[in-house]
Structure formats: C-alpha cells, structure tokens
A protein has these predicted regions:
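Alpha-helical scaffold segments that mediate packing/assembly in large oligomeric complexes
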Residues: 95-199, 311-329
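Extended oligomerization regions of viral-like shell subunits
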Residues: 74, 80, 158-302, 311, ...
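Short loop/turn segments at secondary-structure transitions that flank enzyme active sites
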Residues: 85-90, 118, 127, 148, ...
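Assembly-associated, polar helix/coil segments characteristic of icosahedral protein shells
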Residues: 1-107, 253
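Short, Φ-rich (hydrophobic/aromatic) sequence segments
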Residues: 49-61, 134-150, 154, 199, ...
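Short, solvent-exposed loop/turn segments at the edges of secondary structure
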Residues: 76, 114-118, 291
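A short secondary-structure junction signal
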Residues: 93, 133, 224-228
Length: 329
C-alpha cells in the first residue's frame, strides 16, 4: 500500500487542493502467506533475539583448603618459629633424699619463606569500553585462578623452587599398627570406611584430634553405594546415615584430592599467613600504550607451614593399599 501511495502522490496532491474530478484506483496484490524466508530481508533484525546478561564461565574446581586451615597475616617475607627437639628425660615420682628427675631438650629454629602467586590478562582498551561486564569478569577469572593455585599449593606443594610446602608433603603415611594383617585387631573384609577408621586412630595415638577427612567425590560415592552380598547398603556403626561423617569427623569431598587417596588430619595444625592478600593492578606494560592494550594483574604473597612436631597430625594413604594392610589373613 505504501508503494502505491507513493506512485500516485501527484493525484493525491490534486485531491488535497480541491480537484473533485481527481480519483485514484489502487490495486493491491493478492493476499499470500507471509514467511520468514520470503518476507524478511537478510539485513532485517526482526524478530529480535533475546540475550541473557552476563557471561557463562568455564566450570572450575572450587577451592576449599583456606576454609579448613589456620589463616592469618605476616609482616615479613620469612616465617620463623622455635620448636623443641631431642627431648631427654621425664618427670617422675621421687623418694626423699633421692636425686630428682632431670629433663633437657634442644631448641631449633625453623622457617618457611613467603612465596608469590601471580596471573595477568592483556585486553584492548576498546574491549573494556565496549563489552559490558568484561572488566569484572576478568577480575573474577584472575581471582579464581589465584585461589585455585593457593589451594593446590597448601594441599600438595612440594617445597621446591617457588612452591610452598603443602600438607601432603609433610603428612605421615598410613600405618596399620595393631590393625595390620596378622595382628590382634586385623579387620575382616575391610572397606573404605574401615581404612578411614584406622587412619583416625593413627592420628589420635599421635596425640592429635582429627577434624576433617578429605576424599575425592568418586570415593565418597563408592562408600555410599557399597552393598553386602545380599544387596543391602553397608553403613558402618561409626558412620552417619549419609556417610558424610565418620566417627564424628566430617568428610570434605573435592576433586583436589586424587581419586583413591585420602587425608585425615587436625587441620588446625596447618598454618597459612598472607604477606599480601589478593591485589589487582591495572596498567600499561612495554608497548601496550601504543597498541591500546591494558594489562590486568592479580597477585598474592603467602606462606604455609606445618611444624615438624605436628607432622603426625595428618595421615595420608591409598584406600587399596590401606585395606590390604589391615585385611584379616
């Protein structure tokens, strides 16, 4: 209709000016079906798409160690402490006129250095200006990357180079003790829960009170699904209905633990001190300025330690090896 009106604009003008003899006949084409493929030209934006706000991020493991250990701050680049070593003698009951009991020990200085965790992203100034939320998304990404590295280092850093010395590096290996095959407390057809119960006992006879058990999600699921030969689910008497607590100690499930392994410990004996918390810096580096690039940098400085006198607070092992070690002959 619009095109027909345009074609007859002169006649319409005459009618407007009072020419009663003017008339217009407009023939409209036959009605047809309207289709996206035929009635909407390629450049048209109809219908409009609906886009969700925000950015869908890649799924990553959730860090968890800092929620379990002793965390604080430090004002130096070296954490030092004094600990007892080579203790001799002991207190005892003493008769009248008899020499009293003597005790002596050495004092040893120990230390752990502060290490730095860093990550950066280069992004164009145009992208920061034109893409909504990109700066906050980059900050969140860098933050998560730093936290994941800290988490992994506190758990399993090997202490070499710029690595922290993690809990597993100093943890005590699983030892069956009196539960070993052939010993008085050997276990008939042991399962994963039995292995954990013996590990808990090991921590306790080392004079520590375990407060967390770390396991891979698949191993937790295996415990949940364990059945007897008649098909009923096995639930040890020292475990809760959901198998999330063993002998009063909660299980923390995370893929940071290698499948098949476990760690039982008193996590108050693991210490983290931050020299510098998570910090973000934004600036130009090298030829960034001439290329319109901005560098966003995130870093943190921290130290982790488990005192040598506390190594017995943590027991780590492999489920298969542990079960074989306590199995009744």
């Amino acid at each position: 209709v619009k095109n027909l009106l345009i074609e007859n604009k002169d006649a319409l003008k005459s009618m407007k000016e009072g020419d009663s003899k003017s008339n217009i006949r407009m023939t409209v084409k036959a009605v047809g079906d309207m289709l996206v493929s035929t009635n909407i030209v390629a450049a048209a934006q109809i219908p409009l798409a609906e886009r969700e706000s925000g950015i869908t991020r890649i799924v990553q493991r959730q860090p968890f160690l800092l929620e379990l250990v002793n965390v604080g701050t430090i004002s130096s680049n070296l954490w030092e402490w004094v600990q007892q070593a080579n203790k001799d003698g002991a207190a005892g009951m003493t008769a009248e006129g008899v020499k009293k009991n003597q005790i002596d020990f050495d004092l040893a200085l120990a230390s752990a250095p502060v290490r730095k965790v860093t990550a950066f992203i280069k992004v164009s100034k145009e992208m920061l200006d034109d893409v909504d939320l990109i700066e906050s998304e980059i900050n969140q990404e860098l933050s998560e990357e730093i936290k994941l590295v800290i988490d992994a280092q506190v758990l399993s850093g090997d202490g070499t180079g710029q690595n922290l010395t993690g809990i597993l590096e100093n943890a005590t290996a699983f030892a069956a003790g009196t539960f070993a095959t052939g010993q008085a407390n050997e276990v008939s057809t042991p399962n994963n829960a039995d292995a954990l119960r013996v590990a808990i006992n090991q921590v306790m006879i080392n004079q520590f009170q375990p407060n967390y058990i770390l396991m891979h999600p698949s191993d937790v699921a295996a415990m949940d699904l364990a059945k007897a030969t008649d098909g009923h689910y096995i639930l040890p008497p020292f475990s809760t209905n959901s198998n999330t607590v063993v002998k009063g100690i909660p299980i923390v499930s995370n893929t940071g633990i290698t499948e098949g392994d476990f760690l039982v410990g008193d996590f108050t004996k693991s210490g983290v001190r931050f020299r510098e918390g998570l910090v973000f810096d934004v600036g130009y580096e090298n030829d960034d300025f001439t290329k319109n690039f901005v560098t966003i940098l995130a870093e943190a400085r921290l130290v982790h330690r488990v005192k040598s006198n506390y190594y017995g607070a943590f027991v780590t092992g492999d489920f298969a090896v542990a079960k074989a070690a306590i199995a009744k002959a």
